[in-house]
């Protein structure tokens, strides 16, 4: 198997700049020369503070926005191409499920948007609700769901068409500790089944608990890549800087 076939995501010198200000005379660089290789069959974490460029990179990989420079491939195809997009399951940050839907009708709705037949959706939905721990709650309206339950339903939506790659944007953000643990358990189960998962988070602890490899992004620049074990060992020897604010 070639190196490219063993990778689900590969970027080479990807940059993204935006024009802003009057007449677009000023520019802002959201990503600067990012080169990344994400192996198949792992939970790979993209770690960085808010505003680091994590979501920008995900949107480039999904074809939502265009890169300014560099090359990016997903599952062996150009990022954003139809061949790549149809094989990706995506859970965006702060996704919104129509509140009048139940888990069952929500999966029908999102499956139909993906072009799935109703018979194919119904063949998968109960199995997925079992996986994400919502079996028995499938006929309740999502308006009564907790944030953690909504995120787990979002995971089921992302897996509905049996994608080769699952992309998650801040999947545990705003979720209570119990809900975070439930989401981690689902993701670990998926990884044990051989799924490839690429997620971003600004929470170091979440990355440590679930990911096998990590890339650290800050101010649009890739600072470090490696295994989580290597990262935590490096952080253990790093100096601690504290900043106090107040009156």
Model-based region annotation:
Residues 2-9, 17-33:
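A short, flexible loop at the N-terminus of ABC-type nucleotide-binding domains that lies
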Residues 70-84:
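Conserved ABC transporter NBD signature motif
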Residues 108, 112, 119-137:
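Conserved ABC ATPase "signature" region
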């Amino acid at each position: 198997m070639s190196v490219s076939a063993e990778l689900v995501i590969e970027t080479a010198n990807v940059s993204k700049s935006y024009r802003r200000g009057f007449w677009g005379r000023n520019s802002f660089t959201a990503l600067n020369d990012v080169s990344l290789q994400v192996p198949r069959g792992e939970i790979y974490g993209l770690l960085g503070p808010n505003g680091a460029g994590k979501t920008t990179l995900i949107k480039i990989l999904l074809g939502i926005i265009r890169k300014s420079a560099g090359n990016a491939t997903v599952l062996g195809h150009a990022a954003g191409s139809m061949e790549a997009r149809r094989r990706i399951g995506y859970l965006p940050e702060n996704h919104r499920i129509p509140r009048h839907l139940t888990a069952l009708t929500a999966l029908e709705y999102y499956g139909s948007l993906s072009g799935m037949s109703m018979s194919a959706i119904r063949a998968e939905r109960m199995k997925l609700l079992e996986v994400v721990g919502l079996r028995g709650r499938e006929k309740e309206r999502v308006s009564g769901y907790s944030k953690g339950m909504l995120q787990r339903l979002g995971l089921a939506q992302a897996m509905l068409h049996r994608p080769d790659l699952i992309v998650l944007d801040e999947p545990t953000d705003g979720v209570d500790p119990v809900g975070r643990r439930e989401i981690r358990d689902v993701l670990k189960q998926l990884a044990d089944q051989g799924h490839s998962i690429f997620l971003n988070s600004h929470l170091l602890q979440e990355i440590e608990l679930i990911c096998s490899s990590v890339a650290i992004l800050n101010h649009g620049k890739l600072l470090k890549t490696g295994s989580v074990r290597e990262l935590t060992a490096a952080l253990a020897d790093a100096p601690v800087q504290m900043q106090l604010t107040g009156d």
